[in-house]
């Protein structure tokens, strides 16, 4: 699930609801996931179903909209392995709790906190560095922008508007002045 956020910039509520039928996972090369629903966790008191999660359309999109997201070979391999190793939930979801239910934020948050203690130094654990799983999505978007992927493409893949993308991530682009100078010099001849 965390790999989907890191490699594909999925929101946690999109990742927990990812179904095998939403995925194109070729033997080699890039794949694709097709996102059409999200499962936000809002609490039983606030859902139509009385469950912890409610099935909704994509954030800030019409209910019937599908967002295709190309995924790199690294994520394709991880998802293929995950399905082979763990199978899928009865409804086809890739990720599930031990009882088959939707993965709760408290569950993946607990795993995330434990992973931070293993992977980071004590000082880093005390810092905001990778403080929450949603930060993986921000890392993905920042990585794409720093790799030179055009903002409209990044926005489309991440499910943002270009306006939101540039407002939130404009300062994450490192070395952009030097790159801009080189491109302008190249165009000037």
Predicted regions located by residue number:
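Structural detector for helix-capping/boundary residues
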Residues: 18-21, 139, 167
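Short pre-functional
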Residues: 1-16, 142-146
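Short, surface-exposed helix/turn micro-motifs that flank interaction/cofactor sites
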Residues: 16-17, 155
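Intrinsically disordered, low-complexity basic tails/linkers immediately adjacent to helix-turn-helix/homeobox/MYB/SANT
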Residues: 184-189
């Amino acid at each position: 699930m965390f790999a989907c956020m890191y490699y594909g910039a999925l929101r946690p509520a999109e990742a927990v609801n990812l179904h095998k039928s939403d995925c194109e996972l070729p033997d080699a090369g890039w794949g694709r996931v097709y996102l059409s629903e999200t499962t936000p966790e809002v609490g039983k008191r606030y859902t139509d179903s009385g469950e912890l999660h409610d099935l909704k359309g994509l954030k800030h999109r019409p209910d019937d909209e599908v967002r295709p997201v190309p995924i790199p070979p690294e994520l394709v391999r991880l998802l293929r392995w995950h399905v082979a190793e763990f199978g899928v939930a009865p409804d086809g979801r890739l990720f599930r709790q031990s009882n088959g239910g939707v993965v709760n934020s408290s569950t993946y948050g607990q795993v995330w906190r434990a992973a931070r203690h293993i992977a980071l130094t004590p000082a880093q654990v005390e810092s905001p560095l990778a403080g929450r799983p949603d930060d993986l999505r921000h890392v993905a978007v920042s990585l794409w922008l720093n790799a030179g992927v055009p903002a409209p493409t990044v926005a489309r893949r991440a499910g943002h508007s270009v306006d939101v993308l540039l407002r939130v991530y404009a300062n994450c682009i490192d070395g952009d002045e030097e790159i801009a100078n080189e491109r302008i010099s190249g165009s000037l001849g």
